[in-house]
Amino acid sequence: RLFQRVRFDTEQFHYFYVQNRCHKPINVAMRLQLTDNSWRTQEFYDIGYNERTEGTIESNNSIYYYFAKTLDGSMGWFDEVNGKQKKAFGRTEWFFRKEIFRENGQVLWGDHYTIAECE
C-alpha cells in the first residue's frame, strides 16, 4: 500500500468583528472567551466608516460581549439592562451580550459580524 489513511482532528473557531456603519469613527471593546476558557477584553481604536475591527481572538464559545462609542462620545452601543459591566478604555462600561445564531441546532463556525449603525 503506497498511501496510508491519515485522520486529522481539527477544532473549529468563531472570529468576531464589529463593522462601523456610522459616519463617525468609533472605539470598540470586545470580550471573548479564549480556547483555554479564560476571558479577555480586546480594545480597538479609531475604527472609521465602513471599517471593521481587525485581529480578533479565536474563540469556541458562541457567546461574546461588545461595547462601542464614537470618538467624540456623542453615541454609544451598550446595554444597561441585559448587559454585563466590564472594564474598557480605562472605565467600567456596559457591554452587549450576543450569542451566535444556530441553524437547525448546528453551530455556525467562522466569521461573525456585528454592525454599529447610526442615523
Give names to the regions the model predicted.
Residues 1-59, 68-119:
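Intrinsically disordered, low-complexity segments enriched in small/polar residues
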Residues 61-63:
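Extracellular Ig-like/FN3 beta-sandwich strand-entry sites
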